[in-house]
């Protein structure tokens, strides 16, 4: 059975939650063994897949979880706004570390390596390719190039202002066009994740609301301060 078919079964049985285990950089939680522990806890709680950033974190996580891992490498480049898995060597390192799915930036922006080249390299390793997109045009272009999974990950992050709510319209447009969509980006409540599934998402990735303790504390502190002012 193919990995996509296996995921279809897991999603049908468990609801389609993917947990992104990416601690705040330099957080006390930003250590491979802690990332792996969070991933294992997420798997035991019913996550159908895990999203991991960085080769060391991926290696540590691969050793303890059996669910599929979406691997990425983030870089801050001087000559490109693209941050997610921008280079061939990133793809190779993630494949060697045990990723099942490799996600790349799928936006139409200046980049060091073309999207189609990165997709070909992912498929060279026999892995599934996911593209993190920001618009319907991004997603449909990446689907035509052969990406098996389209993520709404970058919606709201390629523009001057980031909305507070997730982009359900993008989820629906891509789903209606026949894309296998992972809804991602600002899904901070179970209700929002469920809404994404109703809009046609194949699965939903949740990160900050589950694995970024600093963000969660900030949300509570902000709301509670407003209540007493």
Swiss-Prot record:
GO terms for biological process: carbohydrate metabolic process; N-acetylmannosamine catabolic process; N-acetylneuraminate catabolic process. Pathway: Amino-sugar metabolism; N-acetylneuraminate degradation; D-fructose 6-phosphate from N-acetylneuraminate: step 3/5. Its EC number is 5.1.3.9. The keyword Cytoplasm does not apply. One of its GO terms (cellular component) is cytosol. It holds the Pfam family NanE. Keywords: Carbohydrate metabolism, Isomerase. One of its GO terms (molecular function) is N-acylglucosamine-6-phosphate 2-epimerase activity. It catalyses: an N-acyl-D-glucosamine 6-phosphate = an N-acyl-D-mannosamine 6-phosphate. PANTHER family: N-ACETYLMANNOSAMINE-6-PHOSPHATE 2-EPIMERASE-RELATED. Converts N-acetylmannosamine-6-phosphate (ManNAc-6-P) to N-acetylglucosamine-6-phosphate (GlcNAc-6-P). NCBIfam families: PRK01130.1. This is Putative N-acetylmannosamine-6-phosphate 2-epimerase.
């Amino acid at each position: 059975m193919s990995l996509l078919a296996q995921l279809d079964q897991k999603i049908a049985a468990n609801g389609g939650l993917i947990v992104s285990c990416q601690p705040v950089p330099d957080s006390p939680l930003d250590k491979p063994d802690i990332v792996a522990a969070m991933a294992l806890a997420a798997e035991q709680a019913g996550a159908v897949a895990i999203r991991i950033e960085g080769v060391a974190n991926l290696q540590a996580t691969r050793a303890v979880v059996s669910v599929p891992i979406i691997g990425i490498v983030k870089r801050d480049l001087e000559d490109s706004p693209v941050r997610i898995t921008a280079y061939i060597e990133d793809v190779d390192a993630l494949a060697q570390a045990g990723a099942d799915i490799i996600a790349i930036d799928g936006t139409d922006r200046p980049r060091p390596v073309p999207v189609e080249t990165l997709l070909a390299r992912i498929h060279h390793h026999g892995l599934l390719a996911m593209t993190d997109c920001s618009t319907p045009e991004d997603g449909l272009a990446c689907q035509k190039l052969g990406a098996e999974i389209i993520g709404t990950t970058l919606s709201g992050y390629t523009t001057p202002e980031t909305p507070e709510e997730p982009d359900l319209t993008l989820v629906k447009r891509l789903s209606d066009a026949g894309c296998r969509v992972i809804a991602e980006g600002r899904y901070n409540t179970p209700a929002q994740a469920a809404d994404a599934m109703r809009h046609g998402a194949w699965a939903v990735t949740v990160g900050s609301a589950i694995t970024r303790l600093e963000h969660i504390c900030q949300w509570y502190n902000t709301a509670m301060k407003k209540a007493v002012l």
